Amino acid sequence: MSADPRHYDIIVSPVITEKATNLTEQNKVVFRVAPKATKPQIKEAVERLFDVKVTGVNTLTTKGKKKFFRGQRGQRSDVKKAIVTLAEGDTIDVTTGL
C-alpha cells in the first residue's frame, strides 16, 4: 500500500507517555491526530503509513487548559488523540520515524 500525502496531515505525532507505553502490551498505539480527522480516515492513514491491519480506533479530545501568558489570560489548543488497536501479530515502533 502506498501512502498518500494527506495521510501525513491526519497523523500529527505519536504519544509517548507511560500510559501510552503500557497500552502497547494490549496491541494499542496512541497518536495525536488532526482535530477534524474521522475514525475511518485515521484507520486508513495508519494502515497505509505503517503497513499494518487496524481492528479498531477510539478517539478522545482533550480540552485546552486556561493559562496565563505574560500576565494575560489565554487558552491552550484542544488536542485530539486516537487509540488505535492493531491486529494480532502487528506492531508499530513509534520510537523510529516514518
Swiss-Prot record:
One annotated GO molecular function: structural constituent of ribosome
SUPFAM superfamilies noted in UniProt: Ribosomal proteins S24e, L23 and L15e
The keyword Transmembrane helix belongs to this UniProt entry's keyword annotation: no
Disulfide bridge map: none
One Pfam family cited in the UniProt record for this chain: Ribosomal_L23
Keywords per UniProt: Ribonucleoprotein, Ribosomal protein, RNA-binding, rRNA-binding
InterPro entries recorded: Nucleotide-bd_a/b_plait_sf (IPR012677), Ribosomal_uL23-like (IPR013025), Ribosomal_uL23/eL15/eS24_sf (IPR012678), Ribosomal_uL23_CS (IPR001014)
Superkingdom classification of source: Bacteria
One Gene Ontology biological process: translation
Keyword Cell wall biogenesis/degradation applies: no
Gene Ontology CC terms: ribonucleoprotein complex; ribosome
Known function: One of the early assembly proteins it binds 23S rRNA. One of the proteins that surrounds the polypeptide exit tunnel on the outside of the ribosome. Forms the main docking site for trigger factor binding to the ribosome.
Complexes and interactors: Part of the 50S ribosomal subunit. Contacts protein L29, and trigger factor when it is bound to the ribosome.
Cited NCBIfam families: PRK05738.1-3 (NF004359), PRK05738.1-5 (NF004360), PRK05738.2-4 (NF004363), PRK05738.3-2 (NF004366)
Family: Belongs to the universal ribosomal protein uL23 family.
Protein name: Large ribosomal subunit protein uL23
Source organism of the structure: Methylorubrum extorquens (strain PA1)
Lineage: Bacteria, Pseudomonadati, Pseudomonadota, Alphaproteobacteria, Hyphomicrobiales
Record gene name: rplW
